[in-house]
Amino acid sequence: MNFIRQQNYGWAMALPLGLNYFTTSDLPPEKLLKQMWRDVYDCFDQALFDTYDAEMQSFLLHLGSFEQVTPAMAAAVTGMDTASATLLRLLDLGSYMIPDDEGGYVVQPFMHAYLMDVQRRKCSSEFIAEQFDRAANFWRGQGKLQRALEYYHRAGNTDQILILLREESRKKASAACFAELKGYYDLLPNETIQAYPELMSGMCMICSLR
């Protein structure tokens, strides 16, 4: 049962449902849990996603990868003028998300896992990467460097990571800031870092902190 507790995404029904699966099957725990979630997601499809109108389905497919979202970010990613109202519709449904302290919303872990599953089944990897790019562009415009870098990384967009790191190094950011950026410097090949003086400067700052 510890195996289920560790992978229940905070969903209260996972434990009793998992108990039923584990007592009626001889499959290994990993395969059994995978089958349980597949059955659960199929039920969610029938009871939730498949019943929504095309606008709501599109909205969820655009935002399925995000654990947190603000109305402004949702509008930037989806391109929908009705993004704020659609988020309120989701909030009224009661299961998808809860308000956070920043005026946005945190998606419930088990619903986030479900929406990512829907997105993977219905969308191309290029589409998913594009949504991360849009989110990164939004947070970049808001001056939120770490969030922008995180989403460019999840989009696999090393070109934009390179540009952002060069821009940040030119600002002569604090040593503490460079320490936070180390993981993104590590994504770049050594020859790329060596080709740009500002990146070499940033890397030297990072090395001095060790």
Where are each of the predicted segments found?
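C-terminal boundary/linker of central alpha/beta nucleotide-binding cores
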Residues: 8, 41-121, 130
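Residue-level detector of well-ordered alpha-helical segments, enriched
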Residues: 13-18, 55-59, 86, 131, ...
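Conserved C-terminal helix/linker of AAA+ ATPases
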Residues: 22-44
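Extended alpha-helical scaffolding segments used for macromolecular assembly and cargo binding
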Residues: 125-208
